[in-house]
Amino acid sequence: MPFTYHRTINFQDTDAAGVVYFANILSICHEGYEASLRTSGISLKEFFTNPSMAFPIVHASVDFLRPLFCGAQVIISLVPQKIGAEKFEINYEIYLADVLVAKAVTRHVCIDANTRSKQELSMEIIQWLDGYRKDTEEVERRKAREVV
């Protein structure tokens, strides 16, 4: 089952046109990512300040399907998946009520924080990813249908 994160769109999330500023949707998605880690029992303090490893985002994309305004109650549905020994990506779907309003993807690479070289994912992250394995298969099927 995908992880769901509930969020209200705040005034600070919007631009002069009154809709969510394009870069802020990634920030909101990242909040969902952090909530997913926390819910899985991963200490955010240790995860983000661990001096031995880091997980930088090396790719991000967003497709906006409808505008989001201040006060909107959205649900971020996310599914992380392992895509290599040292990387994973997270697929996000942002809903307003039952309407899909945006989709996003972030790709993360595990690196040694000192040498900045790639390293294999930690067991903690592999366990987190394994918790979503069945959902990953459904995401892949949906992506395949979109291409056709």
From Swiss-Prot:
Domain of life: Bacteria
A Pfam family this chain is assigned to: 4HBT_2
The protein, known as: 1,4-dihydroxy-2-naphthoyl-CoA hydrolase
PANTHER family linked to this entry: 4-HYDROXYBENZOYL-COA THIOESTERASE FAMILY MEMBER (PTHR31793), ACYL-COA THIOESTER HYDROLASE YBGC (PTHR31793:SF37)
CDD domains: 4HBT (cd00586)
Keyword Hydrolase: yes
Spans traversing the lipid bilayer: none
InterPro entries registered for this protein in UniProt: 4-hydroxybenzoyl-CoA_TE, DHNA_CoA_hydrolase, HotDog_dom_sf
Membership in a protein family: Belongs to the 4-hydroxybenzoyl-CoA thioesterase family. DHNA-CoA hydrolase subfamily.
Hydrolase in keyword set: yes
HAMAP family: DHNA_CoA_hydrolase
